[in-house]
Amino acid sequence: YSQNAPPNIRKVRNEPETPSSSESVIVGAKVTDPDGVRSVTLEYCVISPGSFVPAKIPHPVPNIPVNNPQQDNPDYEKGWVSVPMVKNGNQGEFASGEDVYSALIPPNENRSLVRYRIIIEDTKGVRARAPFVDDPSLNFAYFVYNGIPNYEGQAGSSLEALPVYHLITRQSDHADCYAYNGGKQINQGTQARFYYNWQGAMVYDGVVYDNIKYRLRGA
């Protein structure tokens, strides 16, 4: 219990939802506090293609200690950039509406994963971060994507008739999960077969589900 709660933040979003590599992105949110809002700060981190950073360190395989919690990955907190968010700034769709704060993220290369979070503080110095500390997603995110490329003589536009999924993860984690190396195959009949040991980001229909956990199905 606290007599002074941190600012209230809601309606967090980014426009466009799925930018191309030539587009800047506006991040906006509505922030209010009865004591007044001192500052709203955007923190963002660009994950280049092929360089995914999990928030947790997976256990080594094949003998996964399923009862031991995974350790935080110190690399997750590296590379974040802080930008002040401006109240009712002239930022596209975020320009209208009271108590709306926004900031601009410059363009990034195709297939970049851009994570972001927002730090809010009231005039009495009470701070909070969104997503909140008990939110397993840890951050908001968007995926920079120029669309399906042409493939084997097939136009990318025709391939869009099927749903497109992206699993963004470390190559080493993906290899350990599939366990083409027989020495890393998890024994049948153990709880380790059902343990979600690896992290990634799933992208579908323009929405990023970051810091999800996965395992090999068929245990």
Residue ranges, per PLM feature:
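Phosphate-handling architecture centered on phosphoinositide signaling
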Residues: 17-18, 26-30, 112-219
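Structural beta-strand segments of beta-rich domains
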Residues: 23-27, 38
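Short edge beta-strand/loop segments characteristic of extracellular beta-sandwich folds
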Residues: 26-32, 43, 104
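Proline/serine/threonine-rich low-complexity linkers at boundaries of modular beta-sandwich domains
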Residues: 1-10
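Aromatic sugar-binding surface patches on proteins
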Residues: 77-83, 89-104, 110
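Solvent-exposed loop/turn segments flanking beta-strands in beta-repeat/beta-sandwich domains
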Residues: 32-56, 113
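Surface-exposed, proline-enriched loop/turn segments that connect beta strands in immunoglobulin-like
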Residues: 12-16
